[in-house]
Amino acid sequence: MARFKHVARKLRLAAALKSNRAIPIWVSAKTRLRVRRGFSLRNWRRSKLKNI
């Protein structure tokens, strides 16, 4: 990827980075382990972002 990134692309990458984190511990405690992990966890090597 180029060193210079357009602002729109940089904002989309930042949003993808923020959405790629585990759920808080209190969520699984409050739902009594019905919710165990986020459904959209992404690894940089396994699955790539589309249209960014």
UniProtKB/Swiss-Prot annotation:
- Which GO biological process entries does UniProt record here? translation
Which protein are we looking at?
Answer: Large ribosomal subunit protein eL39
Q: Which species is the source of this protein? A: Desulfurococcus amylolyticus (strain DSM 18924 / JCM 16383 / VKM B-2413 / 1221n)
A GO MF annotation of the entry reads: structural constituent of ribosome
Query: What domain of life does the native source organism fall in?
Result: Archaea
Gene from which this protein is expressed = rpl39e
Task: Tell whether Ribosomal protein is among the UniProt keywords.
Answer: yes
NCBIfam families, alphabetized: PRK01242.1
Q: Which UniProt keywords apply?
A: Ribonucleoprotein, Ribosomal protein
Family as reported in the entry's similarity comment: Belongs to the eukaryotic ribosomal protein eL39 family.
Q: Which GO terms describe its cellular component?
A: ribonucleoprotein complex; ribosome
